[in-house]
């Protein structure tokens, strides 16, 4: 079932185990459906919560793990939400202490809807839209990291 998929580990902190794998999400590398799969019964959670443990005045949120990885590689502390409908009200508390929470919105209608739904729950949110038809990963892949950094 998961053969030929990219395994994306979701980590969590425990004082007894330090960082350990809490869940694994799988992304198909072919064009098959569904594009993403999780273990049965898994609950929505944030990807790359280790970013929340590092000192930073600003934090970014993306829709999806690949965009979060790409933004992190560009030097932007970023967590990912595993889909446009997966932002949960209790996530809000994790972001209230930041100067800005930059929501790196995909350049399409669902991406803007995701960004708006997150932004309305955070008083420190700023929506940073990607160009039409682009997401963080495709923008950096086609134009380089400066294209992303200049938007912020």
UniProtKB/Swiss-Prot annotation:
Residues 57-137 form the Toprim domain. Pfam families: Toprim_2. This is Gene 57 protein.
């Amino acid at each position: 079932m998961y053969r030929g998929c990219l395994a994306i580990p979701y980590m969590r902190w425990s004082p007894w185990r330090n960082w350990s794998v809490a869940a694994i999400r799988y992304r198909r590398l072919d064009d098959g459906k569904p594009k993403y799969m999780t273990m049965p019964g898994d609950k929505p959670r944030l990807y790359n919560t280790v970013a929340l443990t590092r000192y930073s005045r600003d934090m970014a949120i993306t829709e999806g793990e690949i965009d979060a990885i790409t933004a992190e590689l560009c030097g932007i502390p970023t967590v990912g939400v595993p889909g446009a409908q997966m932002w949960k009200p209790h996530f809000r508390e994790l972001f209230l202490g930041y100067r800005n929470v930059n929501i790196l919105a995909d350049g399409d209608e669902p991406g803007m809807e995701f960004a708006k739904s997150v932004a309305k729950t955070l008083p420190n949110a700023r929506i940073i839209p990607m160009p039409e038809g682009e997401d963080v990963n495709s923008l950096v892949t086609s134009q380089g990291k400066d294209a992303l950094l200049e938007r912020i």
